[in-house]
Amino acid sequence: MPWIQIKLNATNENAELIGDMLMEETGALSVTFLDAHDTPVFEPLPGETRLWGDTDVLALYDAEADTQLIMSQIKASNMLAEGFAYKIEQLEDKDWEREWMDNFHPMKFGQRLWICPSWRDIPDPTAVNVMLDPGLAFGTGTHPTTALCLEWLESLDLSGKTVIDFGCGSGILAIAAIKLGAEKVIGIDIDPQALLASKDNAQRNGVADQLDVYLPQDQPEGLLADVVVANILAAPLRELSSIIKGLVKPNGQLAMSGVLDTQAEDVANYYRDELHIDPIVEQSEWCRISGRKQG
């Protein structure tokens, strides 16, 4: 069935309160916060909510909702300034999951690595193929940060090496490392759902016995790897820099992404004391920082 969407322009100070009011008083089925100006916002730390200065609040209702009544309730709440901007539109019903699946195609990284949705045919059976079902965790290869890390891994000789995927998400980087020759790979993530998705995808690729996954508090003491990849975000890359550097063996290699071009030099400076940093690689405003740890 079709849906009705009401979009309200708010600020980061009142967006959450407005969202609560829409759910509790107007019967909204869901509420979403979007940036009104496409300004990057960074992943909040646990327990923290971080929104844009100019935020659109999108509320979804069923097609029978009384929009005049809803708008009168919104105005009566006095949460928005007089003359606030809003938009009401009807959305056609779609099979969103099917549409997403139809638009997720096999992708090639470097000379020999393919990331293939599990429901698609493999384009090149002789290549290094990672079959992926993202499930509940982020990481399909479509985002520039994932692509930058995959291309970096593909460029290395991983034969017989140990790799840590710090912030493993769906396990795409960890599984790619195994397929590219790594002997052992460890995935670390703060989200238990990510660990489940990583193990499920590893099983799908026949490499589950080469992948161990841990929550940070459960990882073995003294964990070290020849290669570490951390596709997270700038804030945790800064805050966890000592931990991440400590995972890299002497003469080992590290790559990081989830960093915008405006943040790259600052993040890199947190690692220069222990690593020789390579030239920063940029793709669509996102960057990869890589380097080798001093011996």
Curated annotation (Swiss-Prot):
Subcellular location: Cytoplasm
Keywords of the record: Cytoplasm, Methyltransferase, S-adenosyl-L-methionine, Transferase
Gene3D superfamilies named in the record: Vaccinia Virus protein VP39 (3.40.50.150)
Main enzyme class: transferase
UniProt cross-references to SUPFAM superfamilies, sorted A to Z: S-adenosyl-L-methionine-dependent methyltransferases
PANTHER family: ELECTRON TRANSFER FLAVOPROTEIN BETA SUBUNIT LYSINE METHYLTRANSFERASE (PTHR43648:SF1)
Family note: Belongs to the methyltransferase superfamily. PrmA family.
Function, in words: Methylates ribosomal protein L11.
Protein name in the entry: Ribosomal protein L11 methyltransferase
Organism: Vibrio vulnificus (strain CMCP6)
Taxonomic lineage of the native organism: Bacteria, Pseudomonadati, Pseudomonadota, Gammaproteobacteria, Vibrionales
